[in-house]
């Protein structure tokens, strides 16, 4: 498809992954309209881009993505929209009601966006959905190897269990998206990017480490010495990817005609608390006194499930960053605010 100054709507524009997708798309020459929940967030995001001199980004406000017709006004306000990247979906542990605070925004937000595009944006040819490895893995009954042909399963009742809610939200949202394509036959096709835990440099607009994205907490807390004497939470799901590689995958998914209707399991490797600490030790030796001793055993479980990322490599042309590079760059970005 190519960029050629095409216009992209990027939902959840201030999120961790979305912020890096925004940079990737702007660098490739796209015009990008991001959705934010408030004007303050939109202005803050644009101000963070001001030092790059980039004028190809703008924003629209969508306050509550779970509301009926939440995206209608935003979609109608954008002329000649070509492509959509949907990242907006909860990923945090600060919620009280699984349905209202987590499941509805993920599921209704996705289905509602697709309905709005069909109704008001006939020029859109493709939607790329930021899904998750949560839609691929099925704990605790893991096969030896996961790939894009694997589908996670969960019931609505199980989704009410806090430890399952996030995984369920991604499974139901992805399912709703593909069901919409099959049943409503819109003017656009769908591609999903399914990363595991996403690490990497913090977004430019984040100036407080307390506001850091949830997935980077393990790096932040290790860097700050929180786990020097042990006690770090189990490093589930034990697989990771660099956010910059995820951003590249989204751009490729927008541009390659042959990926229509496909899922991509964008996983770089396995990680553990031990491996995170050793990556910090290798890239920032000045922080060694904050880290657990180097002789602490690796906490990656024996016999952990494998993964096959060959489709992402071959079709999307991905070359994944290694853990030391990812963690080292993340720490460097965090030290600017620490």
Swiss-Prot record:
Record's note on what induces expression: Expression is under the control of the azaphilone cluster-specific transcription factor azaR.
Pathway annotation from the record: Secondary metabolite biosynthesis
Presence of the UniProt keyword NADP in the record: yes
Gene3D superfamilies: NAD(P)-binding Rossmann-like Domain
Record keywords: NADP, Oxidoreductase
EC primary class: oxidoreductase
GO molecular function, one term: oxidoreductase activity, acting on the CH-OH group of donors, NAD or NADP as acceptor
Positions with a binding annotation for NADP(+): 41, 166
Documented EC number(s): 1.-.-.-
Family: Belongs to the NAD(P)-dependent epimerase/dehydratase family. Dihydroflavonol-4-reductase subfamily.
Physiological role: Ketoreductase; part of the gene cluster that mediates the biosynthesis of azaphilones, a class of fungal metabolites characterized by a highly oxygenated pyrano-quinone bicyclic core and exhibiting a broad range of bioactivities. In the first step, the non-reducing polyketide synthase azaA forms the hexaketide precursor from successive condensations of five malonyl-CoA units, presumably with a simple acetyl-CoA starter unit. The reactive polyketide chain then undergoes a PT-mediated C2-C7 cyclization to afford the aromatic ring and is eventually released as an aldehyde through the R-domain.
Record-given protein name: Ketoreductase azaE
Gene name as annotated: azaE
